[in-house]
Amino acid sequence: MQYSIFGQKFLKQTGIGQLMDDLSNPPPGSCLLGGGNPAFIPELIEIWREIVSKQIESGSIDKILGGYESPSGILELRETVASILSDESGTKISKDQIAITNGSQNAFYFLLNFFSGNFGNDQRKKYLFPILPEYIGYTDQTLEPDSFLSFVPEIREIEDRYYKYFISLENFDSIPSWKKEAGCICVSRPTNPTGNVITDQELEFLIERANNVGIPLLVDNAYGFPFPNVVFGKNSFIHRSGMIQGFSLSKLGLPGVRTGFVVGDSETITLLHRANSVINLTSANPGQFIALDLFRSGRWKELCEKIILPFYLKKSIFTQEAILNNWSSQIDYKIHQSEGAFFFGFGLGIYLYPLAIFIRF
């Protein structure tokens, strides 16, 4: 069979494809840690059952399963999400700045291709990772090869056994070519797979640098603000002009419904609506209606703060204590400061800087 360049891209395995295959077909005898799959938290499962039971009892399940919604998503849900993000960020956000997608993976496929690749007139742009390591799922999303740039991080050792990645601010001045090559800046917060959270100051720096050259800053909040809010420190949710941010129901405990949200400028949001209609016709209904019930009731905030965040923080503390108390002092290791998400990174000996090993707790 002969395939186009696009088809040939999938003749070989991709990084995220390998990860997802491992989740569904783990090698015999392996300990399945689940990648980014959220834990089955009993209190959350009870809430999902309650919401779906109401849909069945009221008969609304018939419309949910049997009809198409608009490619832009349920209007009331967009209004509700806009209200939540406005309250959390202190910035006025309207429904016209909200898109509903089939998960954040789907959203970033569109966004990364909107802002990288062929811009016409022999001009090509790439997306810039201002800090590494970064989410492996970004690297194979673009239609064109060789589509991303990256800056190495500044690594600071913290106490005896800890370290943390920081954005190396100097890179933005010492490597000026990024200003012409980059079509956008992209970062996840918290970061998959390190559990690193770029600081509010770092985020403000990226906003300023992106605005200075007229490109958007893409922020993936799949594990972060305001839901599921798996952030252990005192960072905050920030939204400014020039930012495009993604959110997901997956890490709330609903990866199977494939529902995500994007907030950005109204023009980019319109592009997302139109792209969604071409690729997906519309976004899946079940996740939208579950989210509408959860967000409209206001229960989402208590769920994040009192159930989800404490659950994963406890896991993080347990993992750190297990390593510190049980690993031999003769092992040359350092733990990446655990700041959020479901991941835990540590480096071994001379491989601390170029290579870290990541586990899910």
Regions found by a protein language model. Give the residues of each.
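Conserved C-terminal alpha-helix-loop-beta "cap" of PLP-dependent enzymes
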Residues: F343-F361
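Generic structural signal for small/hydrophobic residues in well-ordered secondary structure
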Residues: L33, V81, I98, L128, ...
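Conserved glycine-rich beta-strand-loop-beta hairpin in the small C-terminal domain of fold type I
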Residues: G34, I308-Q320, D332-L348
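N-terminal "arm"/small-domain region of PLP-dependent enzymes with the aminotransferase-like
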Residues: M1-E76, S83, D87, K180, ...
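Structural signature of PLP-dependent enzymes
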Residues: H273-I279, S297-I323
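Conserved core of the PLP fold type I
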Residues: K63-V213, L218-R240, I244
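Short helix-loop capping/hinge motifs at secondary-structure junctions, enriched
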Residues: S266-L271, W300-K301, Y351-L352
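Active-site PLP attachment segment
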Residues: K234-R274, S283-P286
